Amino acid sequence: LEQQKEGILEARKEPLKLGMLALMAGNPDSAAEFFKPFLAEEAEPQIRNNLMMALANSYLAQGFAEQAASYYGTVIGLPEKGRHYPLALFSLGKAFELLGEIQKRDVVWRELEVNFSEHPLTFQAQLSQK
């Protein structure tokens, strides 16, 4: 039984490894395919949130603001507001900015300011708005 359990764990690691390689190679679409089982609602929340942030960051870095906004929005909408929440708010604002949606950016950054008034990303957002 223990060997069987180890085999299952090893099999689950493979798509994670391949997905991370795809991310490092600059291919978030391929990474998202490998990550599908880990992005499901019933997946372990910390892994799911980390992978969604990694995908969102990769999309944003490559200028795919719409895809990035989708992942950031999902992270923000999750019931468990973890350590990614301030970065997701800030980055969603950046994605909206790239899309030319300045009013949406300002709404998201206002939420960042209200909930995390002393966070460094709040100060960065305030500077970006000037």
Model-found features: residue ranges?
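Acidic, proline-/serine-/threonine-rich low-complexity intrinsically disordered segments
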Residues: L1-A25, A32-F34
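Short solvent-exposed coil/turn linkers within tandem alpha-helical repeat scaffolds
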Residues: E6-I8, L39-I47, I76-H84, E113-A125
